Amino acid sequence: MTRRINDTFLRACRGEKTAYVPVWYMRQAGRSQPEYRALKEKYSLFEITHQPELCAYVTRLPVEQYGVDAAILYKDIMTPLPAIGVDVEIRGGVGPVIANPIRSLHDVERLGEIDPEHDVPYVLETIRLLVNEQLDVPLIGFAGAPFTLASYMIEGGPSKNYHKTKAFMYAEPKAWFALMDKLAEMTIRYVKAQIQAGASAVQIFDSWVGAVNADDYRTFIKPAMARIFAALREEGAPLIMFGVGASHLAHEWNDLPLDVIGLDWRLSIREARRRGITKAIQGNLDPAVLLAPWDVIEERVKRILDEGMEQPGYIFNLGHGIFPDVQPATLKRLTAFIHDYTSTK
Protein backbone atom coordinates (compact mmCIF):
# COMPACT_ATOMS: atom_id res chain seq x y z
CA MET A 1 0.00 0.00 0.00
CA THR A 2 1.38 3.41 -0.98
CA ARG A 3 1.75 5.85 1.93
CA ARG A 4 0.18 9.27 1.50
CA ILE A 5 2.71 12.03 2.13
CA ASN A 6 1.59 15.33 3.63
CA ASP A 7 2.98 17.74 1.03
CA THR A 8 1.81 21.02 2.63
CA PHE A 9 5.40 22.03 3.37
CA LEU A 10 6.54 21.36 -0.19
CA ARG A 11 3.66 23.33 -1.68
CA ALA A 12 4.48 26.28 0.55
CA CYS A 13 8.12 26.06 -0.59
CA ARG A 14 6.87 26.44 -4.16
CA GLY A 15 4.84 29.52 -3.27
CA GLU A 16 1.49 27.77 -3.56
CA LYS A 17 -1.58 28.36 -1.40
CA THR A 18 -1.97 25.84 1.42
CA ALA A 19 -4.86 24.85 3.68
CA TYR A 20 -2.84 25.95 6.71
CA VAL A 21 0.66 27.23 7.43
CA PRO A 22 3.14 24.34 7.60
CA VAL A 23 5.60 24.28 10.46
CA TRP A 24 8.86 22.63 11.45
CA TYR A 25 11.58 23.75 13.85
CA MET A 26 15.31 24.04 13.39
CA ARG A 27 16.99 21.56 15.76
CA GLN A 28 13.64 19.87 16.32
CA ALA A 29 15.46 16.52 16.30
CA GLY A 30 17.35 16.23 19.58
CA ARG A 31 18.40 18.72 22.23
CA SER A 32 15.09 19.34 24.03
CA GLN A 33 13.81 15.76 23.87
CA PRO A 34 14.34 13.45 26.87
CA GLU A 35 14.58 10.44 24.55
CA TYR A 36 17.48 12.10 22.74
CA ARG A 37 19.24 13.06 25.96
CA ALA A 38 19.01 9.44 27.06
CA LEU A 39 20.73 8.40 23.83
CA LYS A 40 23.46 11.01 24.32
CA GLU A 41 24.31 9.41 27.66
CA LYS A 42 25.35 6.31 25.70
CA TYR A 43 26.54 7.66 22.35
CA SER A 44 28.35 10.68 20.96
CA LEU A 45 26.75 12.75 18.19
CA PHE A 46 28.91 11.11 15.53
CA GLU A 47 28.16 7.65 16.95
CA ILE A 48 24.44 8.32 16.58
CA THR A 49 24.76 9.72 13.07
CA HIS A 50 26.84 6.73 11.96
CA GLN A 51 24.04 4.31 12.90
CA PRO A 52 21.11 4.67 10.46
CA GLU A 53 18.53 3.07 12.74
CA LEU A 54 19.39 5.37 15.65
CA CYS A 55 19.65 8.41 13.41
CA ALA A 56 16.30 7.67 11.78
CA TYR A 57 14.73 7.30 15.22
CA VAL A 58 15.97 10.74 16.32
CA THR A 59 14.88 12.28 13.01
CA ARG A 60 11.30 11.04 13.20
CA LEU A 61 10.73 11.72 16.93
CA PRO A 62 9.53 15.33 16.46
CA VAL A 63 7.18 14.28 13.67
CA GLU A 64 5.54 11.78 15.98
CA GLN A 65 5.62 13.95 19.10
CA TYR A 66 4.93 17.45 17.79
CA GLY A 67 3.00 16.82 14.56
CA VAL A 68 5.31 18.97 12.43
CA ASP A 69 4.90 19.08 8.65
CA ALA A 70 8.48 18.14 7.75
CA ALA A 71 11.33 16.13 9.22
CA ILE A 72 14.91 17.33 9.01
CA LEU A 73 17.70 14.80 8.86
CA TYR A 74 19.57 14.48 12.15
CA LYS A 75 23.17 15.22 11.26
CA ASP A 76 25.81 17.84 11.95
CA ILE A 77 27.12 20.32 9.39
CA MET A 78 30.58 18.87 10.09
CA THR A 79 29.55 15.41 8.84
CA PRO A 80 31.12 15.58 5.34
CA LEU A 81 34.37 17.29 6.35
CA PRO A 82 36.39 14.22 7.43
CA ALA A 83 35.86 12.82 3.92
CA ILE A 84 37.93 15.64 2.43
CA GLY A 85 40.69 15.41 5.04
CA VAL A 86 39.51 17.65 7.88
CA ASP A 87 40.25 16.28 11.36
CA VAL A 88 37.17 17.37 13.32
CA GLU A 89 35.96 16.48 16.80
CA ILE A 90 32.70 17.57 18.44
CA ARG A 91 33.58 18.49 22.02
CA GLY A 92 30.86 18.81 24.62
CA GLY A 93 30.36 22.37 25.76
CA VAL A 94 32.64 23.65 22.98
CA GLY A 95 31.42 22.47 19.59
CA PRO A 96 33.46 21.47 16.53
CA VAL A 97 37.22 21.57 17.02
CA ILE A 98 39.55 21.25 14.02
CA ALA A 99 42.96 19.69 14.63
CA ASN A 100 44.44 20.81 11.30
CA PRO A 101 43.19 24.37 10.64
CA ILE A 102 43.68 26.02 7.26
CA ARG A 103 46.55 28.50 7.16
CA SER A 104 47.70 28.59 3.53
CA LEU A 105 46.95 27.73 -0.08
CA HIS A 106 48.93 24.53 0.45
CA ASP A 107 46.52 23.53 3.20
CA VAL A 108 43.60 24.10 0.84
CA GLU A 109 45.22 22.14 -1.98
CA ARG A 110 45.73 19.09 0.22
CA LEU A 111 41.96 18.77 0.76
CA GLY A 112 40.40 15.88 -1.11
CA GLU A 113 37.01 15.26 -2.71
CA ILE A 114 33.96 13.54 -1.32
CA ASP A 115 32.36 10.40 -2.72
CA PRO A 116 29.10 10.29 -0.74
CA GLU A 117 28.27 6.63 -1.38
CA HIS A 118 31.74 5.63 -0.17
CA ASP A 119 32.49 8.29 2.45
CA VAL A 120 29.11 8.91 4.12
CA PRO A 121 26.99 5.84 3.27
CA TYR A 122 25.31 6.02 6.69
CA VAL A 123 23.80 9.41 5.75
CA LEU A 124 22.25 8.02 2.60
CA GLU A 125 21.12 4.83 4.31
CA THR A 126 19.36 6.89 6.98
CA ILE A 127 17.52 8.85 4.29
CA ARG A 128 16.49 5.71 2.43
CA LEU A 129 15.30 4.11 5.65
CA LEU A 130 13.18 7.12 6.54
CA VAL A 131 11.58 7.79 3.17
CA ASN A 132 10.99 4.15 2.29
CA GLU A 133 9.56 2.96 5.58
CA GLN A 134 8.92 5.53 8.26
CA LEU A 135 7.86 9.05 7.27
CA ASP A 136 4.55 10.47 6.07
CA VAL A 137 5.95 14.01 5.78
CA PRO A 138 8.76 15.32 3.55
CA LEU A 139 12.35 14.84 4.69
CA ILE A 140 14.64 17.87 4.56
CA GLY A 141 18.29 17.20 3.83
CA PHE A 142 20.88 19.81 4.70
CA ALA A 143 24.46 20.99 4.56
CA GLY A 144 26.56 23.78 5.96
CA ALA A 145 27.42 26.61 3.60
CA PRO A 146 31.04 27.21 2.54
CA PHE A 147 31.56 30.35 4.63
CA THR A 148 30.44 28.73 7.87
CA LEU A 149 32.43 25.56 7.19
CA ALA A 150 35.47 27.65 6.25
CA SER A 151 35.16 29.65 9.46
CA TYR A 152 35.50 26.48 11.54
CA MET A 153 38.32 25.21 9.34
CA ILE A 154 40.30 28.45 9.62
CA GLU A 155 39.52 29.43 13.22
CA GLY A 156 40.04 25.85 14.42
CA GLY A 157 36.72 25.92 16.25
CA PRO A 158 33.91 28.28 17.26
CA SER A 159 34.66 32.00 17.21
CA LYS A 160 33.05 35.17 18.52
CA ASN A 161 34.27 37.50 15.79
CA TYR A 162 35.71 35.33 12.96
CA HIS A 163 38.72 37.60 12.70
CA LYS A 164 41.03 34.82 11.47
CA THR A 165 38.51 33.87 8.81
CA LYS A 166 38.06 37.40 7.54
CA ALA A 167 41.78 38.13 7.72
CA PHE A 168 42.42 35.04 5.57
CA MET A 169 39.71 36.14 3.15
CA TYR A 170 41.22 39.61 2.76
CA ALA A 171 44.92 38.69 2.83
CA GLU A 172 44.87 35.42 0.87
CA PRO A 173 42.18 35.82 -1.81
CA LYS A 174 43.66 33.12 -4.04
CA ALA A 175 43.59 30.59 -1.21
CA TRP A 176 40.16 31.81 -0.10
CA PHE A 177 38.56 31.30 -3.49
CA ALA A 178 40.25 27.92 -3.81
CA LEU A 179 38.72 26.96 -0.46
CA MET A 180 35.30 28.22 -1.54
CA ASP A 181 35.58 26.12 -4.71
CA LYS A 182 36.55 23.00 -2.74
CA LEU A 183 33.70 23.43 -0.30
CA ALA A 184 31.18 24.29 -3.00
CA GLU A 185 32.04 21.09 -4.88
CA MET A 186 31.82 19.05 -1.68
CA THR A 187 28.43 20.58 -0.86
CA ILE A 188 27.06 19.93 -4.35
CA ARG A 189 28.07 16.27 -4.29
CA TYR A 190 26.92 15.73 -0.71
CA VAL A 191 23.52 17.38 -1.16
CA LYS A 192 22.83 15.86 -4.57
CA ALA A 193 23.39 12.45 -3.01
CA GLN A 194 20.90 13.29 -0.26
CA ILE A 195 18.25 14.30 -2.80
CA GLN A 196 18.89 11.25 -4.93
CA ALA A 197 18.55 9.06 -1.82
CA GLY A 198 15.10 10.53 -1.18
CA ALA A 199 15.31 13.92 0.55
CA SER A 200 12.37 16.03 -0.65
CA ALA A 201 13.93 19.44 0.07
CA VAL A 202 17.25 20.86 1.23
CA GLN A 203 18.27 23.65 3.59
CA ILE A 204 21.70 25.25 3.39
CA PHE A 205 22.78 26.61 6.78
CA ASP A 206 25.14 29.58 6.79
CA SER A 207 25.14 30.00 10.54
CA TRP A 208 27.89 32.61 10.82
CA VAL A 209 27.62 34.54 7.54
CA GLY A 210 26.09 37.48 9.39
CA ALA A 211 29.68 38.38 10.32
CA VAL A 212 30.33 39.78 6.81
CA ASN A 213 28.90 42.87 5.15
CA ALA A 214 26.95 42.80 1.89
CA ASP A 215 29.85 44.00 -0.27
CA ASP A 216 32.16 41.27 1.02
CA TYR A 217 29.39 38.70 0.63
CA ARG A 218 28.98 39.61 -3.03
CA THR A 219 32.72 39.45 -3.65
CA PHE A 220 33.94 36.55 -1.53
CA ILE A 221 30.97 34.25 -0.85
CA LYS A 222 28.06 34.71 -3.25
CA PRO A 223 29.82 33.19 -6.30
CA ALA A 224 30.19 29.86 -4.47
CA MET A 225 26.57 29.99 -3.29
CA ALA A 226 25.35 30.71 -6.81
CA ARG A 227 27.30 27.72 -8.08
CA ILE A 228 25.84 25.46 -5.38
CA PHE A 229 22.22 26.44 -5.93
CA ALA A 230 22.52 26.32 -9.72
CA ALA A 231 23.85 22.76 -9.52
CA LEU A 232 21.27 21.63 -6.96
CA ARG A 233 18.47 23.19 -9.01
CA GLU A 234 18.95 20.36 -11.51
CA GLU A 235 17.62 17.87 -8.93
CA GLY A 236 14.20 19.55 -8.70
CA ALA A 237 13.89 19.63 -4.89
CA PRO A 238 12.96 22.92 -3.15
CA LEU A 239 16.02 24.77 -1.86
CA ILE A 240 16.08 26.81 1.36
CA MET A 241 18.73 29.33 2.43
CA PHE A 242 19.19 30.31 6.06
CA GLY A 243 21.72 32.44 7.92
CA VAL A 244 21.84 33.87 11.43
CA GLY A 245 22.11 37.63 11.91
CA ALA A 246 22.10 38.01 8.15
CA SER A 247 19.05 40.17 7.45
CA HIS A 248 21.29 42.53 5.50
CA LEU A 249 21.99 39.68 3.05
CA ALA A 250 18.40 38.61 2.33
CA HIS A 251 18.28 40.66 -0.87
CA GLU A 252 21.47 38.91 -2.03
CA TRP A 253 19.84 35.51 -1.50
CA ASN A 254 16.77 36.68 -3.40
CA ASP A 255 18.94 36.79 -6.55
CA LEU A 256 20.03 33.15 -6.18
CA PRO A 257 18.24 30.19 -7.84
CA LEU A 258 16.57 28.98 -4.65
CA ASP A 259 12.98 28.71 -3.43
CA VAL A 260 12.81 29.77 0.21
CA ILE A 261 14.60 32.37 2.33
CA GLY A 262 14.79 31.64 6.04
CA LEU A 263 14.69 34.75 8.23
CA ASP A 264 15.78 35.16 11.80
CA TRP A 265 13.89 37.40 14.23
CA ARG A 266 15.89 40.53 13.43
CA LEU A 267 13.90 41.23 10.24
CA SER A 268 10.12 41.01 10.15
CA ILE A 269 8.44 39.12 7.33
CA ARG A 270 6.48 42.20 6.31
CA GLU A 271 9.64 44.31 6.15
CA ALA A 272 11.46 41.62 4.15
CA ARG A 273 8.71 41.66 1.54
CA ARG A 274 8.67 45.46 1.55
CA ARG A 275 12.37 45.36 0.70
CA GLY A 276 11.64 43.24 -2.35
CA ILE A 277 12.01 39.65 -1.19
CA THR A 278 9.99 37.61 -3.68
CA LYS A 279 10.89 34.07 -2.61
CA ALA A 280 8.83 32.00 -0.21
CA ILE A 281 9.69 32.90 3.39
CA GLN A 282 10.42 30.69 6.39
CA GLY A 283 10.63 31.87 9.99
CA ASN A 284 11.02 33.67 12.24
CA LEU A 285 10.17 33.38 15.95
CA ASP A 286 12.99 34.19 18.36
CA PRO A 287 13.61 30.79 20.02
CA ALA A 288 13.92 32.53 23.39
CA VAL A 289 10.19 33.29 23.22
CA LEU A 290 9.53 29.57 23.73
CA LEU A 291 10.80 29.96 27.30
CA ALA A 292 8.12 32.58 28.04
CA PRO A 293 4.58 31.98 29.38
CA TRP A 294 2.08 30.65 26.85
CA ASP A 295 0.18 33.94 26.48
CA VAL A 296 3.41 35.65 25.39
CA ILE A 297 4.21 32.84 22.95
CA GLU A 298 0.73 32.97 21.46
CA GLU A 299 0.78 36.75 20.99
CA ARG A 300 4.19 36.70 19.27
CA VAL A 301 3.29 33.74 17.08
CA LYS A 302 -0.01 35.29 15.97
CA ARG A 303 1.82 38.43 14.89
CA ILE A 304 4.29 36.42 12.81
CA LEU A 305 1.59 34.22 11.29
CA ASP A 306 -0.54 37.21 10.32
CA GLU A 307 2.42 38.71 8.46
CA GLY A 308 3.42 35.42 6.90
CA MET A 309 -0.07 34.71 5.56
CA GLU A 310 -0.28 38.03 3.72
CA GLN A 311 1.12 36.18 0.71
CA PRO A 312 1.27 32.51 -0.35
CA GLY A 313 4.56 30.75 0.22
CA TYR A 314 5.08 30.88 3.97
CA ILE A 315 6.48 28.29 6.40
CA PHE A 316 6.57 28.86 10.15
CA ASN A 317 9.87 28.20 11.89
CA LEU A 318 12.16 29.69 14.47
CA GLY A 319 14.83 32.27 13.79
CA HIS A 320 17.49 29.80 14.99
CA GLY A 321 17.58 26.39 16.67
CA ILE A 322 15.51 25.23 19.64
CA PHE A 323 17.16 25.80 23.00
CA PRO A 324 17.78 22.61 25.01
CA ASP A 325 15.58 23.76 27.90
CA VAL A 326 12.43 24.29 25.80
CA GLN A 327 9.73 21.88 26.93
CA PRO A 328 8.52 19.32 24.34
CA ALA A 329 4.95 20.00 25.49
CA THR A 330 5.37 23.63 24.43
CA LEU A 331 6.39 22.60 20.92
CA LYS A 332 3.48 20.19 20.64
CA ARG A 333 1.04 22.87 21.78
CA LEU A 334 2.60 25.44 19.46
CA THR A 335 2.35 23.18 16.42
CA ALA A 336 -1.33 22.47 17.08
CA PHE A 337 -2.00 26.17 17.64
CA ILE A 338 -0.35 27.14 14.33
CA HIS A 339 -2.35 24.55 12.42
CA ASP A 340 -5.64 25.55 14.07
CA TYR A 341 -5.12 29.32 13.85
CA THR A 342 -4.09 29.35 10.20
CA SER A 343 -6.63 26.80 8.95
CA THR A 344 -9.45 29.19 9.89
CA LYS A 345 -7.98 32.18 8.05
Curated annotation (Swiss-Prot):
Its main location: cytoplasm. Keywords: Cytoplasm, Decarboxylase, Lyase, Porphyrin biosynthesis. It is found in: Cytoplasm. InterPro entries: UROD/MetE-like_sf, Uroporphyrinogen_deCO2ase_HemE, Uroporphyrinogen_deCOase. Signal peptide: none annotated. Its EC number is 4.1.1.37. Pathway: Porphyrin-containing compound metabolism; protoporphyrin-IX biosynthesis; coproporphyrinogen-III from 5-aminolevulinate: step 4/4. One of its GO terms (cellular component) is cytosol. GO terms for molecular function: uroporphyrinogen decarboxylase activity. GO terms for biological process: protoporphyrinogen IX biosynthetic process. It comes from the Bacteria. It catalyses: uroporphyrinogen III + 4 H(+) = coproporphyrinogen III + 4 CO2. Belongs to the uroporphyrinogen decarboxylase family. HAMAP family: URO_D. Catalyzes the decarboxylation of four acetate groups of uroporphyrinogen-III to yield coproporphyrinogen-III. Homodimer. This is Uroporphyrinogen decarboxylase. The gene is hemE.
